[in-house]
Amino acid sequence: MVSGLSWKDHEYMTSALAPEDVGWDWFGLQFYNGTALMLFQIRQADGSVTRFSSGTFVAGDGGVIPLESSDFRIKTTDRWTSDQSGATYPIAWEIEIERIGLTLRGAALMANQELRLSRTYWEGAVALEGRYQGMPISGRGYVEMTGYVQRLS
């Protein structure tokens, strides 16, 4: 018998980026205390992120808290450069959402999780730890990053 967890990803509207947008960073994170967090930021050519970046926090009781781009901060703390594509990807982050009392440190379980298909993406597993409302929190998740090799159109 085999058991475990899996992830099914169905993406809609990849081509919906504005002309000044180059790609996105998407985080799907599940914590051992029963909470979950989804965040995405759409990156622009000048290094900024759009106001359309957003997220959702799901509390342990199932309550949902929508997050706007102004509610969270994602800071890259380490990077990895692919020998294959030459792209440099973030592989460790600090995430802060002061509004809900959440601070996280996360890192890729392994640096090379680049997918070289018709578009080159970095998609991979991450581990996280931090504090939620003053209590320790940890979990696992999945991160998808696009537009580091070529702008998505």
Predicted regions, residues:
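Structured soluble/peripheral alpha/beta segments that form catalytic or ligand/cofactor-binding pockets
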Residues: 1-153
